[in-house]
Amino acid sequence: MTKVLVLYYSMYGHVETMAKAIAEGAGSVEGVEVTIKRVPELMTDEQAKKAGVKLDQSAPIATPSELADYDAIIFGTPTRFGNMCAQMRNFLDQTGGLWAGGKLINKVGSVFTSTGTQHGGQETTITSFHTNLFHYGMIVVGVPYSCQEMTNMNEITGGTPYGASTLAGGDGSRQPSENEIKIAKCQGVHVAKVAKKQSAS
C-alpha cells in the first residue's frame, strides 16, 4: 500500500478545503492510502480567536518524525509575502534529523497554496517551498497540463504547473472555485500515481 500524507496549515479554511480535494484525488488511485494532518498553530488560543482563525479543523496535528512513514507528502500553506507561513516554516525547521538521516530521500513531494489576491505570490510560494524538498532529496511533482482546468481562461482562477492554488480575496470571503478544486484533485491523483510507481520500484 502506497501511503500519502496531505500536510497543511490553514488559517481561515481555504487551504483546508484544498487539502481535502487533494486527498480525495489521491485516494481515488487504487492501492493508495491517504492521511490528512496539519501542523501546529503558533498563536495562543486567545490570539487565534481574535485573528478569526478557523479552529474547528478535524485534521489531527502531525509530528515531524512521522514524515518518514509516508511515500509521498503533499504540503499546503497559505502565502506570507511570497513564502510559506510561519507555522509551516517552524514545523519544517524541526526536520533536521530526518534530513541528516536521509529519511526523505526518493520520497515524492508536492506543494499547494492559497493567496489573498490574483498576483499574491502563488508561484513563488510553491517554488520557494520546493527548495526544502530538494534539500530533503525528494522527487518534486507539480500539476501536469493534462489537467484541462489548468488552461481555463474564462475566469480568474488559481492553478499552476508547480501546484494547485486558490484565491481567498482580501477579506477571505472567496472560497476555492470548482475549477481550483478540480486542479487540486488532479494534483492528488498525479502525486499518488507517481508515488505508487516509485514505491514499487
Curated annotation (Swiss-Prot):
It comes from the Bacteria. InterPro entries: Flavodoxin/NO_synth, Flavoprotein-like_sf, Flavoprotein_WrbA-like, FMN_Rdtase-like_dom, NQO. Its cofactor is FMN. SUPFAM superfamilies: Flavoproteins. Residues 4-191 form the Flavodoxin-like domain. Binds 1 FMN per monomer. Coiled coil: none annotated. NAD(+) binds at Y12. Pfam families: FMN_red. FMN binds at residues 10-15, 79-81, 114-120, 135. Its EC number is 1.6.5.2. One of its GO terms (cellular component) is membrane. The keyword Repressor does not apply. Substrate binds at W99. Keywords: Flavoprotein, FMN, NAD, NADP, Nucleotide-binding, Oxidoreductase. It catalyses: a quinone + NADH + H(+) = a quinol + NAD(+); a quinone + NADPH + H(+) = a quinol + NADP(+). GO terms for molecular function: flavin adenine dinucleotide binding; FMN binding; NAD binding; NADH:ubiquinone reductase (non-electrogenic) activity; NADP binding; NADPH dehydrogenase (quinone) activity. Belongs to the WrbA family. This is NAD(P)H dehydrogenase (quinone). It comes from Hydrogenovibrio crunogenus (strain DSM 25203 / XCL-2). The lineage of its organism: Bacteria, Pseudomonadati, Pseudomonadota, Gammaproteobacteria, Thiotrichales.
